[in-house]
Amino acid sequence: MVNLEPSESLLEGRRYLEWLASDCEIIKDYSLQGEEIWLLKIRLKNNGRKSKYIPDYSDWHVFIDSKYPNGNIQFYPSKKNGISCVFPHQSPHSEEISEEDYFRSNICLEQFSPSLEFDVEDANSKLYNYTEKALEWIKQAANGDLLADGDFFEKVAYPIKKFHKKVLFSEDEKSFVDWNKYEDERVGFLNMKAGKPGTEYQDFWYVTDYYKGVSGYMKKDATIISYSWGKYVTDEKSRGEKGIWIKLLSMPCIKPWQAPKNWPQLIKIFEENNLNFTEDVMPFLNNLRDRNSHVMMLGFPVSERIGGQISEMHWQSLELPVLSDYKTPNRFFKGFQKNIKGFEMADMRRIFFREKISLEWLSTKNWSPDNLVSRGNLSKDIKKRKFLFVGAGALGSMLAEMLVRSGVIQLDIVDYDVLEMGNLTRHSLTASDIGKYKATSMEKKLIESFIHYRGKGFNMTVEEFFKKQDFDMNEYDVIIETTGNDKVLDLIASKKLNLIVISTSLGLYAKRMYINIQHGSKVELTKFKESILEWIEKDREEFSHMEYPRDGLGCWHPLFPARIDHLSMLASSSMSIIESDILQTKESLTIIERGELGTVSILKRKEFTDGD
């Protein structure tokens, strides 16, 4: 049943606003909006400088969840006596609904003041705290201080209507250096590749190449920048798409912090960036008169932090309207023939001069490798190395997936075995891979785990792999052996490989894990086997009373016993050891042991020197 009266918590929160004295005035008490939202209209004082954008007092619609103090609190500027423009830490003006008396552009108070998200949800203080932060936001907006030097760069909030469509690019510091080589190139064509047809990803557009010149599209000698997407993108048999790129001197923005709404506003921004729309841009648009919509990408240089060094090219895309051609109605030409000049004039009349035609901004994301793994990535020195995995069993699959999901792009896998149903208890692969080779199945999984992954699976023994005619061990930096097989260890050692060789193996029931790391061409794995021999014997003694699991009826064959949670604990710990020792160029033998309640400890650690 809907409660038609505000709760005691809501009333208590409103009473606390009295402590804000003359800074906050309630102009209309609570009113119920639907079943779950209460509206409180207030007037807030500008305690900052005089501003042409912000009045001395502004009216606000405050929407509060009926479950207060739980739930959201959102501040929207009123259309009458409110703030009509957009500032940083504020959502864009979405398409206005005329009967509403407020702008749908709430202040992002949790972003402006992250501590609000962690405040204790107390009826006495929550509404007061949010209102106090709104007052501070107004003050800083008036003073021009919402973005200060040292803050992370914030892009203008471009209003998006077609959220299903995304334009994806991959820019970093290296590509920015490449862009600087073409400083005089301001406009050109680009090529994009669509996601998998017939799926929800078919409207994901991956930019692949940028070209210079009106006649440069898809010409190798006209290529400026090409992104190195992984197999997830490059192997997809999908259609390409022609678009246009324009490089600006700064982010396309209308003061104080608003995305341009229409073509006249955007064309004015082009002029401010020393670009003439009819002379510099229109010749490229004339190549897109095919009755289809196309994408326009606007690029601009940015820094990671406000006031910092410019280090990256960022892009914002929009969807172009269908341009005029011979099928366009005659009424748009008015004295002009249906030729290039006539098409241009028709477009200016029906599209580019009209303020009522809104720009169709598209969701645009930088899916560079570093950006995609920023929530949990490895060091750059690890990510840039090329790995070879020998063995794609439970341990190998876990370690390989951890490395790739953490940003490793080049990782090949060698394994001749096929996946069996019993493997699923602790393997990264799934039931759809039963009966398939582990190596190529892992390749497929890693491709879908990280879109920049470019590794390969080889369905063969390591002996066969080393004998391949096109095999070149110099292309790898690290080899990780996860088989625990003495013959494989001996073979790797005999090759005198001038790289980092890592051997990992598990004890019974994943009680212990053995990690050996050696550098250079003098890899000696005999000492490794000798060093862990006593611990292997200890495994046998400790678990002598245990009966090994079997794989169904028939001829008895013991299986390696280990639970997936125990295995993943040791694998995760070994990742940290491997990363640390590679970065510090250490050679070592480390034995880690699983303890009680999910703990892992180092049982033995020996770091080798040249004399060892």
Regions found by a protein language model. Name each.
Residues N377-V418:
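Glycine-rich adenosine-cofactor-binding loop
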Residues S324-F387:
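N-terminal charged helix/coil linker that caps or initiates catalytic domains
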Residues E443-E475, T483-D486:
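A structured beta-alpha segment of the ubiquitous adenosine-cofactor-binding alpha/beta core
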Residues N81-R186:
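Domain-scale recognition of soluble eukaryotic interaction modules
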Residues M1-D56, W60-F63, V156, H164, ...:
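Long, charged/polar, low-complexity intrinsically disordered N-terminal extensions
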Residues Y158-R349, N474-D612:
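Glycine-rich phosphate/adenylate-binding loop
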Residues K28-E110, S125:
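Compact alpha/beta protein-protein interaction domains typified by the UBC
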Residues Y416-I451:
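Glycine-rich phosphate-binding loop and adjoining beta1-alpha1-beta2 segment
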